[in-house]
């Protein structure tokens, strides 16, 4: 049996290829951008804040954060003040919502959601900070000292992650160093401020959670701080560097590190 080859004009092939490409892009955008965006957190003009989460199948949704009144938390080491918790109310299309009853004072705040007992991040807020093994979303209410935490239109310093050899500990280690604007070309000598984190922290703690570079940039620009070098070390003598930055790979962060008090 013989088969006759059918000729398909090139313009039809090109048209079909373009059509399929457009359909693919359209479906991809629909998957990425499908539905109305959920705005969260929404900071209102009076500094009240609305938190939203789309969870149509959830039974209970709560928000927990340091902007809420504290609650007592029992631990093996006794009772401590922990972040408060507030309930969200379900609205249209399965979007849950909570608005703070009072305006929030200027500050950097952290929070997360609890959905049916499971703690999750706010998918509408890409800004997050790790504190030891905890990850939370963050937002800033501007004004007062909180403006120091922002990136403002001022000269900016440089943040470097530097590896050095420690003969005492027998390993290479990592530190974070802030140098003020103009440091590289000034030819001047600068005072050095050594900044150590708290228990469980590392060389990333102050620069991320503590907003060191933003605060120094702003204070120096305002003439309220002398230009200086800030060295942020890793005080855990058993660590080369922060979790995920060592040759051990992406190990889980821990508070109970060996040699913690020898750093």
Regions found by a protein language model. Name each.
Residues 2-13:
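Positively charged n-region of N-terminal signal peptides that target proteins for export
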Residues 6, 18-19, 27:
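Intrinsic disorder/low-complexity segments
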Residues 38-42:
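Short beta-strand segments of immunoglobulin-like
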Residues 43-263:
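Non-catalytic cap/lid and distal C-terminal segments of serine-dependent acyl enzymes
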């Amino acid at each position: 049996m013989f088969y006759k080859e059918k000729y398909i004009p090139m313009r039809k092939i090109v048209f079909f290829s373009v059509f399929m490409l457009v359909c693919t892009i359209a479906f991809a955008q629909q998957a990425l951008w499908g539905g109305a965006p959920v705005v969260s957190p929404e900071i209102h003009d009076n500094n009240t804040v609305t938190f939203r989460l789309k969870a149509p199948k959830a039974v209970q949704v709560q928000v927990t954060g340091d902007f809420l009144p504290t609650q007592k938390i029992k631990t093996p080491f006794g009772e401590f003040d922990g972040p408060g918790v507030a309930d969200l109310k379900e609205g249209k299309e399965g979007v849950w919502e909570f608005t703070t009853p009072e305006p929030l004072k200027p500050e950097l705040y952290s929070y997360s959601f609890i959905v049916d007992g499971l703690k999750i991040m706010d998918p509408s807020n890409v800004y997050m900070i790790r504190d030891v093994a905890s990850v939370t979303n963050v937002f800033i209410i501007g004004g007062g000292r909180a403006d120091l935490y922002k990136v403002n239109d001022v000269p900016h310093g440089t943040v470097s992650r530097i590896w050095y050899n420690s003969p005492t500990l027998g390993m290479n280690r990592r530190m974070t160093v802030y140098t003020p604007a103009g440091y590289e070309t000034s030819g001047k000598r600068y005072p050095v401020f050594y900044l150590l984190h708290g228990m469980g922290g590392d060389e990333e703690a102050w620069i991320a959670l503590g907003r060191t570079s933003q605060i120094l940039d702003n204070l120096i620009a305002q003439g309220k701080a002398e230009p200086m070098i800030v060295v942020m070390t890793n005080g855990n003598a058993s660590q080369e560097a922060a979790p995920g930055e060592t040759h051990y790979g992406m190990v889980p962060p821990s508070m109970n590190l060996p040699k913690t008090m020898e750093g």
